[in-house]
Structure formats: structure tokens, C-alpha cells
Amino acid sequence: MTDSTCEGAGEDGDGIQWLAEIGGPHPGGPHPGGPAAGGPDADGEVGGVVFARGIPPRELARRMGADPAAGTEPISGTDIRDLDIEVYRPGDDGDGVIRVGECGGWSFAIEYGDSTGGELLTEIARDGVEVVHFRPMPEQRPALLDYARDGAVLCGFGLGEERWRWGQEPDLLVPDLVAASVLEPDGITPCASAAGAGAGAAHCRTLGAVERRFGLSLPRAALDGLRLPAYAVRGTPGMEPR
């Protein structure tokens, strides 16, 4: 089986600003304790997207816990709903599934169910690999972004809460956020123009800053009709359509 790319979606995909459509604002203060596990769901909705530069898609799947020889034939995002995925098991792990591909020089994994991208972030990022992890967090907002490299989380923040940051270099992306009119030059105060634009537009600015910094892109079709190989990364999901 060969690894899938974003062929058919345009050479550079669709950027990543559109991922704001599956995230959202958080009504309170900073995300407690920094990054947390994403909130999977039972209906095939996306629990996160992992981008990795420096490894092919199959190796990304392996680092996320998959048997690299056990990928399915390419399936669409809608086909995920036909797999037997038990998201939650009392006292045990739920099932985690990913679909993997490559776009713009980055491998990507789209996460479903009880996936592993958050807890294995530093493992994915070892040996010089760069990783950007986006989690929409629909049940526990804000949506979260983390950047890791060489086995360490360098920086992370919530969309709309960029002034609260974590990681070994929490201010790494501040110049990019300032240039995108997300934050004022002090790196703390939100730009008035971003606040007045509404949450969706403000989140697009943040994702646009990350997109430009790292050259990230993901075709919209990857969440829908684009067919990509799928892997089990946790639990015992049924990988044959029901």
C-alpha cells in the first residue's frame, strides 16, 4: 500500500485556516494545566489533526501506536462512521483510529475516537521531527495548538487565548502572532482589531499565522471524500466497515 497525498486538492491543499470551523472559543480563562487530551466523539467527527515534518505518513502512524503493516485500503472521512469504534470503555481505553496522508512536505494524521496524538506528541517529535497538533476540543474549549520538535513541546496555546502559553519556548510564535494582528507587540494584549472581528475570524488569524510560519496545508476533502489509509492506534476497533 502506498501513502496517500493531497493529489486532486490542489498542489498546496487549502491551508489550515479553515480548521477554525471545527474549533471554537472558550468562555472562561486559560486552559487549566496547559494541553489536555482531545475530546473524541462517537460519530466519526475529527478529534484532532497531527502534522509531522521529517517522516512519511506510515512512520507517523507507527509513532502514534499503529502497526504500520496493518493499514486499511484508502477510505474516506465518511467511511469512518461505518467502522466499529468504541470511543469509551469504563475502566479501559477506548478505540482510536487515524487516517494518514501527506501534503506540502508534511505528513498528517486525522484523528478519530480515543486517539493518541496528544499524549504521544513528544514521541512523534523525536529525532528532529517537527510536529504541529491541532485539537478542536468541542466539549472543552478552546481549540488547542501545540508545536513540538526534537522530543519536546516548544510552545502551545488555545485559540483566542494566545496570551496564555506553555512549553519550553512559550514565546516562540509571538512574532508571528503579532504580525498577524492577533497580539499586540507586548505579546500579551489581544489586538483590538482581532477582538472586534469575532471569534471565527480571530481564530483564522491565528491559524493563518501558524500556516505561514510552517507552510502547513490540509485539503478540506481530507475530512470528507478524499480516500486515505486508516490505522488503529488504540484499543480494538473493527477496521472493516459494518
Q: Which positions does each model-derived feature cover?
A:
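Hydrophobic alpha-helical segments that drive targeting, anchoring, or assembly
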Residues: G8-V182
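Long, compositionally biased intrinsically disordered terminal regions
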Residues: G13-I16, I22, R141, D146-R242
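Elongated, non-catalytic scaffold/linker segments and compositionally distinctive motifs
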Residues: M1-S4
